[in-house]
């Protein structure tokens, strides 16, 4: 029976532990035998994803700070009650400062925590963009992913920084929270006209979801034929009878 193998197949090895140099009987290290922990192996498994490197690690730490600050504020808003935290989680929010604080650093309980969270989250996203860009250049790949991510970052910065800057206060920014940011979006839509009738909004959503589905279809198809060599798509794309050509024919026939 053939094994399913491709360049993305992760390999996990679990050999017998090496105990090192023989120690005198009675030594404490003799009793401390090494063990294998599956979860720790997944965390450090280089075959499951690329190594994070310095930029990736810095980005993860900054994101963790932002995540913890949001979580702590959510907990504080329900008097540190874990049951209420879980029950009310969709309604909890970390709000930006009120308009009267303009652009100054507001007191912690009046929007200061939101400003600090926004700083950590923004720096995390910018450092991660730098990580994606650098990895692509180091591997000799195109920087398409970095610039696609940059377009999403532009939307994030527009709503959370550029627009509030032009309007003169942090109160115009998006709050952190599930229903809170949806309520903000609904209010924004009512303020500037219904977004659902905006043709540019329609086109952006259509291209966003359409491109996501097309990329998923392509990636899934190539993975499905990778055991036949279809992952070598660049080399096979112009040849007849190859796995990549059969994959292309499948969708060509499907689309009519």
Swiss-Prot record:
Q: How does it sit in the membrane?
A: Multi-pass membrane protein
Q: What is its main location?
A: membrane
User: What's any one GO cellular component for it?
Assistant: plasma membrane light-harvesting complex
GO biological process terms on file: photosynthetic electron transport in photosystem II
**Subcellular localization(s) per the UniProt record:** Cellular chromatophore membrane
GO MF terms here are:
bacteriochlorophyll binding; electron transporter, transferring electrons within the cyclic electron transport pathway of photosynthesis activity; metal ion binding
- UniProt entry keywords in alphabetical sequence: Bacteriochlorophyll, Chlorophyll, Chromophore, Electron transport, Iron, Magnesium, Membrane, Metal-binding, Photosynthesis, Reaction center, Transmembrane, Transmembrane helix, Transport
* Signal sequence coordinates: none
Entry's Gene3D superfamilies? Photosystem II protein D1-like (1.20.85.10)
User: Out of the domains of life, which is the source?
Assistant: Bacteria
Q: Which Pfam families match?
A: Photo_RC
Which InterPro entries did the record assign?
Photo_II_D1/D2_sf, Photo_RC_L/M, Photo_RC_L/M_CS, Photo_RC_M
Where does the chain bind (7R,8Z)-bacteriochlorophyll b? 181, 201
Q: Which residue ranges traverse the bilayer?
A: 52-78, 110-139, 142-167, 197-225
Q: Where does a ubiquinone bind?
A: 251
Q: Which SUPFAM superfamilies match?
A: Bacterial photosystem II reaction centre, L and M subunits (SSF81483)
Residues reported to bind Fe cation: 218, 233
The record's comment on protein family reads:
Belongs to the reaction center PufL/M/PsbA/D family.
**Function, please?**
The reaction center is a membrane-bound complex that mediates the initial photochemical event in the electron transfer process of photosynthesis.
Task: Please give the subunit comment from the record.
Answer: Reaction center is composed of four bacteriochlorophylls, two bacteriopheophytins, two ubiquinones, one iron, and two highly hydrophobic polypeptide chains (designated L and M).
Which NCBIfam families is this protein grouped with?
Answer: pufM
Name assigned to this protein: Reaction center protein M chain
| Higher taxonomy | Bacteria, Pseudomonadati, Pseudomonadota, Alphaproteobacteria, Rhodospirillales
């Amino acid at each position: 029976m053939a094994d399913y193998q491709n360049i993305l197949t992760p390999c996990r090895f679990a050999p017998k532990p090496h105990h090192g140099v023989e120690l005198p009987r009675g030594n404490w290290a003799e009793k401390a035998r090494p063990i294998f922990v599956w979860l720790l192996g997944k965390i450090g498994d280089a075959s499951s994803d690329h190594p994070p490197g310095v930029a990736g690690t810095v980005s993860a730490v900054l994101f963790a700070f932002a995540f913890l600050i949001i979580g702590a504020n959510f907990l504080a808003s329900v008097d540190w009650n874990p049951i209420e935290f879980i029950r009310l989680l969709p309604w909890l929010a970390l709000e930006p400062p009120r308009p009267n604080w303009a652009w100054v650093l507001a007191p912690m309980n009046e929007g200061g925590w939101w400003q600090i969270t926004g700083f950590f989250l923004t720096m995390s996203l910018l450092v991660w963009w730098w990580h994606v860009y650098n990895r692509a250049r180091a591997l000799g790949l195109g920087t398409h992913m970095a610039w696609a991510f940059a377009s999403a970052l532009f939307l994030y910065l527009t709503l959370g920084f550029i627009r509030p800057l032009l309007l003169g206060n942090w109160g115009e920014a998006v709050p952190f929270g599930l229903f809170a940011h949806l309520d903000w979006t609904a209010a924004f839509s009512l303020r500037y006209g219904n977004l659902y009738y905006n043709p540019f909004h329609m086109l952006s959503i259509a291209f966003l979801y359409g491109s996501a589905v097309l990329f998923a279809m392509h990636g899934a198809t190539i993975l499905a034929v990778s055991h036949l060599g279809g992952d070598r798509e660049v080399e096979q794309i112009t040849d007849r009878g190859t796995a990549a050509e059969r994959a292309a024919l499948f969708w060509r026939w499907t689309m009519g």
